[in-house]
Amino acid sequence: TLSLHDALPISKVPKGQGYLPAFWLMANDENVYGQWPRCGEIDCMEVMGQETNKAYGTIHYGNPHSESQGTYTIKDGADFSDDFHTFTCDWEPGKITWYVDGVKYHEESDWYSTTVGQGTLTYPAPFDQPFYIILNLAVGGSWVGNPNDETSFENNPYEIDYVRVYQKDSYNEDVKRPPKEVTLRDPDAKGNY
């Protein structure tokens, strides 16, 4: 059971249309806030098999379904199927941060949840409850499409060297929803906004 942590797998992904290797987290108990997406989901790493130079980090939450996503594109023509890479998801109260090979590429600190009959719940719900780790390789689906004639099923594994999970001794759990930044447009010639 995980609640507040820094999780670090090192993995090498398969290449080919229709593959979707992933490292993600789901709520231990969907009854706390309700079924997905109300219960929350943290995608620490997803890589599309036909686009193995890009990793996605995403949170899913709320009702109706909302998501916030960041992407990391590997440099110099390399891709995540060539070699092992570290994918880190640092989850603290009120903030989730994603890294690839130690490079920060995305941070989220604003979300919400809802439950049936209670309306919108206060931040940091739903990411204030225990989650569990899932490491899987999905094949096919609406996002990555189905495998095609060029997709190899032989000698094309999703390799995971290790998974490490750390938990800090203490956290600042008195988190507040970040204020929304308001941007005013420039006034027109008459001074109206």
What is each residue range found by the language model?
Residues S3-Y193:
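GH16 jelly-roll
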